[in-house]
Curated annotation (Swiss-Prot):
One MF annotation (Gene Ontology) recorded for this entry: fimbrial usher porin activity
Organism: Bordetella pertussis (strain Tohama I / ATCC BAA-589 / NCTC 13251)
Protein task: Probable porin-like protein necessary for the assembly of a pilin-type protein.
Family: Belongs to the fimbrial export usher family.
Name the record gives this protein: Outer membrane usher protein FimC
PANTHER family (alphabetical): OUTER MEMBRANE USHER PROTEIN, SLR0019 PROTEIN
Glycosyltransferase keyword on record: no
């Protein structure tokens, strides 16, 4: 009970440190009176917790954030506020930034005095924010080791997300990587009796920014073994072009011409490489302010931008939309209170890029048909491009030239008050073996609009008409050879294979939110063909809502093709269930297709485990007199995932096992982990076995000190390790690392660790007053090795096998403990116990030899990422 007020005081201190946002020149707003503490903590020095930033002066590795967005992670010098010219008598330490750090934080250095900027750059000295930027503020979060800075927008370059330069991209290390997925199935009875094993392999080798990749499949079944290499490629980046270069098996995007595969080369711009501010189209907001006004921009009721503008015309293009589509409502409030409101149209389904931006792609090689490797492979070249000619207006086009085939495309997309639209035309010329040349055209129109009043979203994804002489490249090649096997440069007739070519396409989707009553959507598709009376049509109507905790979905569809017309009605209900150690959901459905019996099903699926690593489920499905029962479960661990399923019906049973995993071979050995198909982070944390990766399902550090984690390319990735499961003698000097990887790279994430000797310093009865809360413990050299917590004890790290520890009491006297860990007793968690015995205060200094009594482990204050010793250089 004596420790309760002490815990409360610590909580208040940390709450002030985490929540306060005092400027460096702000006086202490609160005072913690040590007289309110009970027991030996009475009289402890708590003055430094009177401030939101309770750090002592020194160098600390911290994560710097601006407006809750991560900027950089660097070692920052903290100086006493009174030495920074603030004139405080008692004050916290404040951050002091160098020229390089200010530049990395993307502040507007041109707004400062040029002489001051030149001095910072040449001298290498640092300066506090309060001297550089008026009204700037800072606060430090002990628990997160996070320095939050607030700088007025006038002094910042990017108001929302920090743009990333190609110079910051990390190409990664030399490594071999392998991802695998397997499936084993045993069918008993029914039409598919037998066993089958399939294995998918995704392998690669990375070397100095070049990435070799191969995807292959292996299969065993019905007494046969099959192996197939699906794709092999070698790729790298061209940073100055913001483009990627690929050799080998490549695929066309399908954005301009119908997609196809080829073996050759492809080079083209990649939007993921662009700065954040250029990746997403957004219309420029233009207006005129009569006075110094406040501008607010709303999208779907969400505030996406707010800033003050001077009198005169203004143009705003550095905001982040809440969604890709939906008109923007602009509210301009003048200094005299007058308000003007206007709307800027913004729609999304039609692709648009920013004014002045150009995106392009070029490919050349031989056509590849995975279904017929023996087919003749014509050479093909494709060039496409898109350019933003004005705000909301794009021109795009392309050329495709191949043996016996040529095509050209030109189009325009634009944003209007009535919605976003795009229109293009494609002309083709095909040399067919029987009928000679076939010339044709294909017209396409797209439209999208979100109605602001009702929030109705309209997507006319495709309205296309193709003439009888129009062929796309893949259709012409796949028509098959006729007599000459295509060696005369002509293609066979498509109709000879009994296949029709598309004539017209129409598709539309509407969605309508109904507030608290759910949402409604309608979609329709119609397709006609040349050379046939075939018509494919599909209509779907859906409604979803929430009734209490029950989710309700109703779907009605009609599908019509040449063979049949089918109607289907389906009702789904889902009920979430929550328990102390697990969670799950019960789903039930009723479905009726045509005149078939009503199909009923009830399923339960759940998750359990500390990190939801276990999933399980069971279900029953009934239609008429037949029933099917299913049972499944899965496990996700550090080294992969495994799942199994058992299905049993009236005349058949099926057993199925699926799994996946991956590995990376590098200079430090071979590290196993979960399946990774993209960019990989290789965690290196020596002696930190068991440390888990925060915000991942089950990634962790293995016994060799390595781990694997998935990363997002060309973006700032923050990977955090949890020290919760580490032994007390191992300390992570850094729990968070940041990296900006290239696509496909294996990037090293080095977490420095300290494997120090740790011990427990415990005050003997009668000496508790020497080891009160917050008291620093130093070794014989004067280095801080620990801070006292509760229970008149302190966890000390980095101590030698024998020596002296000392603490300074409130009256200035020093109490020492001489120890030898070889003869010390064992405390909780196997740590050696060092006893501290002191004379009453005022009685001078007194040393104490080590004793072997065990004590309970106390709590202690620690600062993540840096030793407690102030390091002012």
């Amino acid at each position: 009970m004596k420790q309760i007020p002490l815990i409360l005081a610590m909580s208040l201190a940390f709450a002030a440190a985490a929540k306060g946002e005092s400027a460096p020149d702000m006086q202490a707003a609160v005072n913690f009176d040590s007289a309110m503490l009970w027991g030996g903590a009475n009289g402890a020095d708590l003055s430094r917790f009177n401030y939101s930033n309770a750090l002592r002066p020194g160098n600390y590795i911290v994560d710097i954030y601006a407006n809750n967005y991560p900027l950089i992670r660097q070692q920052v010098r903290f100086v006493a506020a009174q030495t920074s010219g603030q004139g405080l008598k008692t004050a916290p330490a404040v951050a002091c930034f160098t020229y390089g750090q200010l530049e990395a934080m993307q502040v507007r250095l041109r707004a400062l005095d040029p002489a001051l900027v030149a001095d910072l750059k040449s001298s290498g000295r640092c300066e506090v924010l309060g001297k550089l930027f008026p009204d700037s503020r800072e606060s430090f979060d002990f628990g997160e080791n996070r320095l939050e800075v607030s700088i007025p927008q006038a002094y910042t370059i990017n108001r929302f997300r920090r743009d990333i330069s190609p110079d910051e991209w990390d190409s990664g290390i030399t490594a071999f990587r392998l991802g695998y997925q397997y499936n084993y199935a045993d069918y008993i009875g029914g039409l598919r009796a037998g066993r089958r094993l399939d294995l998918n392999l995704y392998s690669g080798f990375n070397f100095k920014g070049w990435y070799l990749r191969n995807s292959s499949t292996l299969g065993w079944g019905q007494g046969r073994f099959t192996r197939r290499s699906q794709r092999t490629s070698l790729q790298t980046d061209i940073p100055s072009w913001r483009a990627r270069l690929v050799f080998g098996d490549v695929f066309s995007s399908g954005e301009y011409f119908a997609p196809y595969s080829m073996r050759g080369m492809l080079v083209g711009s990649d939007t993921a490489m662009l700065p954040y501010s250029e990746r997403l189209y957004r219309p420029t907001i233009r207006g005129v302010a009569r006075t110094r006004a406040n501008v607010k921009v709303y999208q779907a009721g969400v505030l996406v931008f707010q800033d003050a503008v001077p009198p005169g015309p203004f143009a705003i293009d550095d905001y982040s939309p809440a969604s890709y589509g939906g008109d923007l409502r602009v509210v301009v409030t003048e200094a005299n209170g007058a308000v003007q409101t206007f709307t800027v149209p913004y729609a999304s389904a039609v692709r648009l890029i920013l004014p002045g931006q150009t995106q392009w792609s070029f490919s050349a090689g031989r056509y590849r048909n995975y279904r017929n490797d023996g087919q003749d492979r014509p050479w093909v070249t494709q060039l496409t491009g898109r350019h933003g000619v004005a705000d909301g207006v794009n021109l795009y086009g392309g050329l495709l030239i191949a043996q016996a085939y040529q095509a050209g495309l030109a189009g325009l997309s634009w944003n209007t008050p009535w919605g976003a639209m795009a229109a293009d035309a494609t002309l083709s010329r095909s040399q067919l073996s029987t009928t000679g040349n076939a010339n044709g055209s294909s017209l396409r129109f797209s439209y999208s609009k979100t109605l602001s009043g009702t929030n109705t979203a309209i997507r006319l994804a495709t309205l296309r008409y193709s003439s009888s002489g129009f062929w796309n490249f893949a259709d012409a090649v796949n028509a098959g050879p006729v007599e000459t096997n295509g060696r005369n440069g002509r293609f066979g007739l498509y109709s000879l294979l009994g296949r029709e070519r598309p004539r017209g396409d129409f598709s539309v989707t509407l969605s309508q939110p109904l507030g608290g009553y759910g949402s409604l959507y309608v979609s329709a598709l119609r397709r006609t063909y040349w050379g046939s009376s075939r018509v494919d049509q599909q209509t779907q109507l859906g409604y979803s809502t929430q009734v209490g905790r029950v989710g309700v979905n109703l779907d009605v569809s009609r599908t019509e093709n040449r063979r049949s017309t089918e109607h289907q009605v389906m009702l789904n209900l889902s009920i979430p269930l929550y328990g102390a150690t697990s969670s799950g959901v019960v789903t039930g459905s009723l479905a009726r297709t045509g005149s078939a019996p009503v199909q009923q099903s009830v399923n339960y699926s759940g998750m359990s485990g500390e990190r939801d690593q276990y999933t399980y489920g069971l279900g029953v499905q009934r239609a008429g007199t037949s029933a099917q029962y299913a049972l499944n479960g899965s496990w996700s661990g550090t080294y992969g995932e495994v799942s199994g399923q058992l299905t049993h019906g009236r005349s058949y049973s099926q057993y199925q096992i699926n799994g996946s995993g991956g590995l990376v071979a590098h200079a430090g050995g071979v590290t196993f982990g979960q399946y990774q198909a993209g960019t990989i982070g290789l965690i290196q944390a020596e002696a930190a076995a068991g440390a888990k990766v925060v915000n991942t399902r089950n990634a962790a550090v293995d016994r060799s000190g390595y781990g694997l984690v998935s990363l997002t390319p060309y973006s700032l990735n923050e990977v955090e390790l949890s020290p919760q499961d580490l032994p007390l003698d191992v300390q992570l000097e850094s729990t968070v690392e940041q990296v900006i990887p290239r696509a496909g790279a294996v990037v090293a994430l080095r977490f420095p660790t300290r494997h120090d000797v740790a011990a427990m310093l415990v005050a003997e009865p009668g000496s508790e007053g020497a080891l009160v809360f917050g008291t620093e413990v130093r070794d014989g050299a004067g280095k801080v090795v620990g801070v006292a917590g509760q229970g008149a004890s302190a966890l000390v790290r980095g101590v030698s096998a024998s020596g002296t520890l000392e603490v300074t009491r409130a009256d200035g006297s020093i109490c020492r403990a001489t120890y030898d860990l070889k003869s010390a007793g064992q405390a909780v968690h196997g740590l050696p116990r060092i006893a501290l015995a002191c004379a009453p205060q005022g009685g001078g200094e007194r040393g104490a030899r080590a004793a072997g009594q065990a004590v309970a482990q106390p709590s202690a204050i620690s600062i993540s990422g840096k030793d407690h010793e102030p390091d002012i250089r």
